[in-house]
Amino acid sequence: MHLSIGSPCLSNTVSLHYLNLPPIRYSDTQSQDPVAILQRKLASGQLVLDRDKQHGVLPSLLKQLDVPVEFQVLVFSKTSLQIHKISPTNPRALYLSDSVYVGYVPGSSILELAANDPALGAVFYTLEVDPKTDGSELVRDPGQWLAPQELIF
């Protein structure tokens, strides 16, 4: 059985086209959300995320985004880019503030972020951390998370 979320007649490409038309212009509009501001600081070298032996850059990331470590929830749902790593024995932790969500899966080198932007609404990011180096890359999603997706049951 196929279940379409969004319009079943629109492909992802067509849907992304509509997101890039006025007034949204998703791809052309520079985000002003807390994650975008952090992204610019990281890219310019103005800021480097500290690493923790147990949790990597997560504590530093939460601190920079003003997301309290105490405000978290563990979820077992597979609504993640990392569905193959989430299980009842390895849940995803969601850290929340009023404007930012950070998803952390133990054993993964990817953190998933969502931020509330005043002009764009929800903006999605991934932070991929290279465990062998001090490198990390914070990337804004180009819109694929916003396009209709097809689920197969």
Identify the function of each model-found stretch.
Residues 56-61, 95-100, 130-134:
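Short alpha-helical segments and helix-capping/turn motifs at coil-helix boundaries
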Residues 82-105, 114:
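N-terminal low-complexity, intrinsically disordered segments
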Residues 104-153:
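Sequence context surrounding c-type heme c attachment/ligation sites in exported
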Residues 18, 26, 95, 101-104, ...:
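Sequence-level detector for tyrosine residue identity
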Residues 10-81, 91-93:
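Conserved small-residue
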Residues 1-4:
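Bacterial N-terminal signal peptides
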